[in-house]
Amino acid sequence: MTKNIGKITQIISAVVDVKFTNNGELPEILNALECYNDKHRIVLEVAQHIGDDTVRCIAMDSMEGLVRGVEVIDTGSPIRIPVGTETLGRIMNVVGEPIDGKGDIKSSNISSIYKPAPDFTNQSTERNILVTGIKVIDLLAPYTKGGKIGLFGGAGVGKTVLIMELINNVAKAHGGYTVFAGVGERTREGNDLYHEMIDSGVINLAEPEKSKVALVYGQMNEPPGARARVALSGLTIAESFRDMNEGQDVLFFVDNIFRFTQAGSEVSALLGRIPSAVGYQPTLATDMGELQERITSTKYGSITSVQAIYVPADDLTDPAPATSFAHLDATTVLSRQIAEFGIYPAVDPLDSNSQVLDPMIVGEEHYSVARQVQQVLQTYKSLQDIITILGMDELSEEDKLTVARARKIQRFLSQPFHVAEVFTGAAGKFVNLADTIAGFKGLVEGKYDDLPEAAFYMVGTIDEAIEKAQTLK
């Protein structure tokens, strides 16, 4: 079979025009093209056909040093990456090349990053709780096995720390495989995560096949093409784990879905498409749907995904985070106001929700305690204007008691994290679901009305709060 060869005719930023004149065959849309810049392989993805003999492509790597006239080869297929157990313990980029300096990834399985979502008939509808060990999440917005979970928050409120703690609590205890896709985030954070995984044994450098995680990075310094496709590369590996050996349960972490949208917006602008609301690409909902519909569980295996989603200017109505909401089973909203109180994780207990907070799924006691906690916090929120203007003395005795309990609940929703031990000096806590429910049930029923507020701050179980109260006396 003769190779289809073209030549670069124009380079503008990350957009490259390639002319094919030899036999008039144009590469298909989404095909991967290859060219070489000083022996360095650069992959281009076909985005548009311009006229009869030219394609417009998006580069997956830096274009520095590339010139017009360079030969480009059509691979005849979309971007293909290695998948399967050979990827465990390794870091790769969007096109499947290793970036950890440990040699090639020798996998017999190569897969396209574009795949259809599983058929409706093959999808699973089971609902089981995934216990995270984080009180505020397990009580008020529980996660599901095989569900899609979104962590929403503005800049600097703790999305990445929360995702790292979930990796620590869930992935380490989880028997199956984990895939982490770093989409347009800080390289330093990706490096920290890699070394933490080595220290904790999730990545085994001596015997990589015993590792439990595969990492795919397309960080902030990458061109928009790479950032727009790296989530698909990570998802392709997660799908391969899900479908192997008659089904596996896979964890898929993405940090950050907003950067996927942002990169799509940059690519759209570079291709000259007319922007839609707030400057986003006109295909925003389609792009998000193509990614999210593939993150699903089948009758054989499951993908549980946890996605950090940056909220620009703390505005949840911005089109990027708003488009994500429709696809999620549970949303954990991180609030700047709660972070300002020094309560971490800064999860908003009234804004966060989950489809599985249902008495038929979580049980009557869990549901009842969660709703009582939210009721107390909502009452406190509605009384805050009166407290600010007139002071606590103007409240009725009943309202004073509600406020006192709400403040204790607020503090008890905080928790020291394992991954933050180096910053806080406090040992991390994993709290079982039964202990979480029992602790909050006692609080709303008034069992601990005599304990000081400070006793509930940054502790694990209610027993630790009682012990702390003894030391405060």
Curated annotation (Swiss-Prot):
Its EC number is 7.1.2.2. GO terms for cellular component: plasma membrane; proton-transporting ATP synthase complex. It is a peripheral membrane protein. It is an enzyme of class 7 (translocase). It catalyses: ATP + H2O + 4 H(+)(in) = ADP + phosphate + 5 H(+)(out). Gene3D superfamilies: 2.40.10.170, Bovine Mitochondrial F1-atpase, Atp Synthase Beta Chain, Chain D, domain 3, P-loop containing nucleotide triphosphate hydrolases. Belongs to the ATPase alpha/beta chains family. HAMAP family: ATP_synth_beta_bact. This is ATP synthase subunit beta. It comes from Rickettsia africae (strain ESF-5). The lineage of its organism: Bacteria, Pseudomonadati, Pseudomonadota, Alphaproteobacteria, Rickettsiales.
